[in-house]
Amino acid sequence: METMKSKANCAQNPNCNIMIFHPTKEEFNDFDKYIAYMESQGAHRAGLAKIIPPKEWKARETYDNISEILIATPLQQVASGRAGVFTQYHKKKKAMTVGEYRHLANSKKYQTPPHQNFEDLERKYWKNRIYNSPIYGADISGSLFDENTKQWNLGHLGTIQDLLEKECGVVIEGVNTPYLYFGMWKTTFAWHTEDMDLYSINYLHLGEPKTWYVVPPEHGQRLERLARELFPGSSRGCGAFLRHKVALISPTVLKENGIPFNRITQEAGEFMVTFPYGYHAGFNHGFNCAEAINFATPRWIDYGKMASQCSCGEARVTFSMDAFVRILQPERYDLWKRGQDRAVVDHMEPRVPASQELSTQKEVQLPRRAALGLRQLPSHWARHSPWPMAARSGTRCHTLVCSSLPRRSAVSGTATQPRAAAVHSSKKPSSTPSSTPGPSAQIIHPSNGRRGRGRPPQKLRAQELTLQTPAKRPLLAGTTCTASGPEPEPLPEDGALMDKPVPLSPGLQHPVKASGCSWAPVP
């Protein structure tokens, strides 16, 4: 029976489509349980999923009082390259407030160009990426969630990642405390997986949309092989150079080299969750504010034990897996300590059986969390550190207990020094823009008692991805900025763009279509 259940689980979402979930108010109460439910439906196979909160929920009463938050080190993202293959690095700019940044983002020089739809804007992005470098207000430590927001508050998700601080006394900003990102048109994040191949969650608080691209985890190694061929100098210098977050590869190049991927656009008021070893990239459509943090589940532990590490020191963020294995995999702890744990990660296997109802998981999840001493943690790190404001003197920074692990930079992949804080509000509610599903997404409405107990989730069939001959309209991939420091290795001369495709990568020209995964079309 268990074998049959396992096979049924693997059959969920065989095309690796990005799935969209609409939890009810009740289903939204337990974050850990809902992530398990999403995986039981196969959401993890895409590497990325969208969650649209219930209409009764809100992250924050008002955003009217955030203009004086200080962006201490805005970063100008400079890209070089051609034919859909770029590198990106940062130039530090002078500090500015969020209000000043918003004004800059909406100025004639940096504003979003006129466009007919998202696809038209994507074409403009890739055609003009190397010109007029945008400025990103990234890696700002803090949260915009109100303290009284109990569900899906990124300041205290209460997942097993809390063991990192509880058992090891380690706090890494951006990993187990939230980061804020203030974006403008063309600000980007390059192809990467999360540090230690953790999960991540991103909430778009306000502003213009964010487009995401993702390669299914079961095809991540194919992207790595292609990146090594396209960036041979970086590959020779570091075995895990994609962790530097400098490599920009367009969807056209991915398609020409047979790399399966998907695309979706996130709008204000929506969550995106990335799954372990899901390579992702993307760009912002205009001024916006997002918040992100990593988290973990029991399914991640084997990923963490096998995660690649930056070997050159440019972007090394790591921590011991000891507490996670000792507490959550006690039967394998001794083998793991001796280096004899031969577990193999199964990218297709979900965390819980697909037949297990969402409503019956509470008695399984809660006792386990209680046994570990996990709870909905208050944002103690936030309360001790007020926001850095432009006119405020004597701003305090919360002391991080990281031993030799400095703060990681989510944008550049480098380790940097700690920064500060969090803010809360209490005014009128803000409106949440309506959302529109992406072209390759499944809509998931989990069943509940009111709509018919035990009824399987409603699914709107996704547009199937095929290995068609490229059409005229390009499908795009996103990018991020690299850290300040040495400039990227030389690429083909600047100026040529996606209309001149790069040669196909040897050995990847005629890939065998893997079981159950989709192939991204150029619409």
Curated annotation (Swiss-Prot):
<dbReference type="GO" id="GO:0046872">
    <property type="term" value="F:metal ion binding"/>
</dbReference>
<comment type="similarity">
    <text>Belongs to the JHDM3 histone demethylase family.</text>
</comment>
<feature type="binding site">
    <location>
        <position position="280"/>
    </location>
    <ligand>
        <name>Fe cation</name>
    </ligand>
</feature>
<dbReference type="GO" id="GO:0003684">
    <property type="term" value="F:damaged DNA binding"/>
</dbReference>
<feature type="modified residue" description="PolyADP-ribosyl glutamic acid">
    <location>
        <position position="27"/>
    </location>
</feature>
<dbReference type="GO" id="GO:0140684">
    <property type="term" value="F:histone H3K9me2/H3K9me3 demethylase activity"/>
</dbReference>
<dbReference type="GO" id="GO:0005721">
    <property type="term" value="C:pericentric heterochromatin"/>
</dbReference>
<dbReference type="GO" id="GO:0006338">
    <property type="term" value="P:chromatin remodeling"/>
</dbReference>
<dbReference type="GO" id="GO:0000785">
    <property type="term" value="C:chromatin"/>
</dbReference>
<dbReference type="GO" id="GO:0072562">
    <property type="term" value="C:blood microparticle"/>
</dbReference>
<feature type="binding site">
    <location>
        <position position="244"/>
    </location>
    <ligand>
        <name>Zn(2+)</name>
    </ligand>
</feature>
<keyword id="KW-0560">Oxidoreductase</keyword>
<dbReference type="GO" id="GO:0035861">
    <property type="term" value="C:site of double-strand break"/>
</dbReference>
<feature type="binding site">
    <location>
        <position position="192"/>
    </location>
    <ligand>
        <name>Fe cation</name>
    </ligand>
</feature>
<feature type="binding site">
    <location>
        <position position="310"/>
    </location>
    <ligand>
        <name>Zn(2+)</name>
    </ligand>
</feature>
<feature type="binding site">
    <location>
        <position position="202"/>
    </location>
    <ligand>
        <name>2-oxoglutarate</name>
    </ligand>
</feature>
<feature type="region of interest" description="Disordered">
    <location>
        <begin position="407"/>
        <end position="523"/>
    </location>
</feature>
<dbReference type="Pfam" id="PF02375">
    <property type="entry name" value="JmjN"/>
</dbReference>
<feature type="domain" description="JmjN">
    <location>
        <begin position="18"/>
        <end position="60"/>
    </location>
</feature>
<keyword id="KW-0804">Transcription</keyword>
<feature type="compositionally biased region" description="Basic residues">
    <location>
        <begin position="448"/>
        <end position="458"/>
    </location>
</feature>
<dbReference type="GO" id="GO:0000724">
    <property type="term" value="P:double-strand break repair via homologous recombination"/>
</dbReference>
<dbReference type="GO" id="GO:0001932">
    <property type="term" value="P:regulation of protein phosphorylation"/>
</dbReference>
<feature type="domain" description="JmjC">
    <location>
        <begin position="146"/>
        <end position="312"/>
    </location>
</feature>
<dbReference type="GO" id="GO:0071479">
    <property type="term" value="P:cellular response to ionizing radiation"/>
</dbReference>
<keyword id="KW-0832">Ubl conjugation</keyword>
<dbReference type="GO" id="GO:0032454">
    <property type="term" value="F:histone H3K9 demethylase activity"/>
</dbReference>
<feature type="binding site">
    <location>
        <position position="194"/>
    </location>
    <ligand>
        <name>Fe cation</name>
    </ligand>
</feature>
<dbReference type="InterPro" id="IPR003349">
    <property type="entry name" value="JmjN"/>
</dbReference>
<dbReference type="GO" id="GO:0010468">
    <property type="term" value="P:regulation of gene expression"/>
</dbReference>
<feature type="binding site">
    <location>
        <position position="238"/>
    </location>
    <ligand>
        <name>Zn(2+)</name>
    </ligand>
</feature>
<feature type="binding site">
    <location>
        <position position="210"/>
    </location>
    <ligand>
        <name>2-oxoglutarate</name>
    </ligand>
</feature>
<feature type="binding site">
    <location>
        <position position="245"/>
    </location>
    <ligand>
        <name>2-oxoglutarate</name>
    </ligand>
</feature>
<keyword id="KW-0156">Chromatin regulator</keyword>
<dbReference type="GO" id="GO:0005654">
    <property type="term" value="C:nucleoplasm"/>
</dbReference>
<dbReference type="GO" id="GO:0032452">
    <property type="term" value="F:histone demethylase activity"/>
</dbReference>
<feature type="binding site">
    <location>
        <position position="312"/>
    </location>
    <ligand>
        <name>Zn(2+)</name>
    </ligand>
</feature>
<dbReference type="Pfam" id="PF02373">
    <property type="entry name" value="JmjC"/>
</dbReference>
<keyword id="KW-0805">Transcription regulation</keyword>
<dbReference type="GO" id="GO:0005634">
    <property type="term" value="C:nucleus"/>
</dbReference>
<keyword id="KW-0223">Dioxygenase</keyword>
<protein>
    <recommendedName>
        <fullName>Lysine-specific demethylase 4D</fullName>
        <ecNumber>1.14.11.66</ecNumber>
    </recommendedName>
</protein>
